[in-house]
A protein has these predicted regions:
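Phosphate-binding loop of NTP-binding sites
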Residues: 10, 90-238, 242-255, 285, ...
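Active-site beta-alpha connecting loops in nucleotide-dependent enzymes
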Residues: 45-48, 332, 357-388
Length: 388
């Protein structure tokens, strides 16, 4: 793909290219991975500035440089520098254009807790209902049974759009992906055609990065204000404090809103009764009552399952088979996962809970299933949000 193709419609960028129109073979923001024909995005971060590595990138064969307005031009006259106001956002948009194709139905899930489980449950429901489905998040990229390990909740733009393109090429039509506050704040999801956006909940996390709770919420809200397509649907937890704010934001854009939870108008949780193998649910949806057995323990898993249900309905699934499919859900690895029993028969669970709210939630979830003492073992990484 020529630079002029990649920058199509951006006259300012083409002007800065000064007649140079190299063949672009890839994109990267890591100067060490530059190859012949790559665009090097000189991004600034909390600890380093990519503009320091422009010369290194050119030595390795960079065909063009994407950088912030005001960045000095490189000494190599044949390597154009494209200055933009927001290099991170533009980098993601270029990655989307370079890789080209995406599955038709992409649901992005944000919130402090529940993103992974909701994404995997959504993928499972779509698959049960006969759709070629995949997911992207903390557990890596999953598509048609294959798994590609990952370490970030939201991958960098190149890995993300490459993954979406590969999913499209193998026939995946439905993708559920996690949208972290870091990923949203750093514009990693820009260029993704999000058709359904879901919000699970919000509690203290990542304040070492965002600086305040308001900024943390604002990063999450970008999914609804900036990224959800104009004819998309917002799936919102009606039981959280942020519901009214997000609903008003979405309605102002003319978006469809679908709510779930005890206070919801669309998928209303009437009752959730725990038993030895899961939870008995009574739901009101589409003017009908549904009684099903969810094979998952914990009220938080109930909410994650309802979020997934709302997502698949918002993406076009018929409500009756979608609700019945909840009875076939399987637990997610590392999320309230039963890994064994002690010598005296006490069950041992592993859970990803790492925030104060998540720890409290998971302990409350096991209480109905435990007559005696609950032992909780947890750790805390250093150098992060000490208030947790």
């Amino acid at each position: 793909m020529r630079l002029s193709e990649l920058m199509a419609g951006d006259q300012a960028a083409l002007k800065h290219a000064q007649g140079q129109d190299p063949d672009i073979t890839g994109l990267t923001a890591d100067s060490r991975t530059v190859k012949d024909g790559y665009i090097f995005a000189a991004l600034s971060g909390a600890k380093d500035d990519g503009s320091k590595y422009i010369a290194d990138a050119i030595k390795l064969g960079a065909a063009a440089i994407l950088a912030k307005d005001g960045t000095p031009r490189p000494s190599a006259p044949t390597v154009p520098l494209i200055p933009v106001e927001n290099p991170r956002k533009r980098y993601a948009q270029l990655a989307a254009r370079f890789y080209g194709q995406q599955p038709a139905n992409i649901a992005a899930i944000t919130g402090t807790n529940g993103k992974t489980s909701t994404a995997i449950f959504t993928e499972q429901l779509w698959t049960i209902m006969g759709n070629m489905s995949g997911s992207i998040g903390t557990l890596g990229i999953r598509a048609a049974g294959a798994k590609i390990p990952g370490s970030l909740t939201t991958p960098d733009p190149v890995a993300l759009h490459q993954g979406l393109n590969e999913m499209y090429e193998i026939g995946v039509t439905h993708v559920a992906m996690e949208a972290s506050s870091h990923g949203l704040d750093q514009y990693r999801l820009d260029g993704v055609k999000v058709t359904v956006a879901a919000f699970t909940n919000l509690s203290r996390d990542h304040l070492d990065y965002h600086g305040s709770f308001d900024k943390y919420f604002a990063a999450k809200a970008r999914l609804f204000s900036d990224l959800l397509v104009a004819d998309g649907t917002a799936v919102l937890n009606a039981d959280v404090e942020q519901f009214a704010t997000l609903k008003a934001m979405c309605e102002k854009r003319g978006l469809t809103v679908m709510s779930y939870g005890e206070n919801a108008d669309d998928i209303k949780l009437v009752s959730a009764i725990p038993d030895s193998t899961g939870t008995k649910l009574t739901l009101l949806a589409n003017k009908g009552e549904y009684k099903i057995h969810l094979p998952l323990m914990g009220s938080f898993q109930v909410m994650n399952a309802l979020a997934a249900l709302a997502i698949v309905i918002a993406s076009g699934a018929d409500i009756d088979p979608a609700v019945l499919a909840l009875e076939k859900l399987e637990g997610v690895r590392g999320r309230m996962e039963l890994v064994g029993k002690t010598s005296f028969g006490a069950p041992v669970f592993v859970d990803y809970a790492h925030t104060p709210d998540a720890l409290e939630t998971v302990i409350k979830a096991v209480r109905p299933h435990c007559k005696g003492r609950i032992v909780c073992v947890f750790g805390a990484g250093g150098d992060r949000d000490t208030g947790k």
